[in-house]
Amino acid sequence: MTDKTLEYRIHTKNPEPLTVIIEPWAEEVVLSPGSSLSLNILYDKEDLMEVETNPNYYVVWLWGGCRVKLAMNGEDLTRPFLLTPSP
């Protein structure tokens, strides 16, 4: 099986920190003003990604079977459980 990769980037210019939540793992990352977060989504079957926003948070819902690698401003934040396929 060969994984496909989708890169999704979130940039914040808010004057306040922005909380980004990656579901279904409930992984929270707090972005300081001017920061960016890269999500490298690994998958073999494409499906729907959903996003919910408000001024204080940004929620990204990924689809079943995918995995994700995170990097904030180029620094790897990937924790091992994020590389386990989502339910």
List PLM regions with ranges.
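Hydrophobic residues positioned within well-ordered beta-strands of beta-sheet architectures
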Residues: 6-8, 20, 39
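Charged, amphipathic alpha-helical segments
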Residues: 1-5, 45, 53-55
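Intrinsically disordered, low-complexity Pro/Gly/Ser/Thr-rich segments with frequent PxxP/GP/PP motifs
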Residues: 23-44
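Short, structured beta-strand/loop micro-motifs enriched in basic residues and often containing a Trp
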Residues: 15-23
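Asparagine-centered strand-capping/turn motif at beta-strand->loop junctions
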Residues: 4-14, 62
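Glycine- and charge-enriched low-complexity intrinsically disordered segments
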Residues: 48-87
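A cross-taxa feature marking solvent-exposed loop/turn segments within ectodomains of secreted
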Residues: 15, 44-46
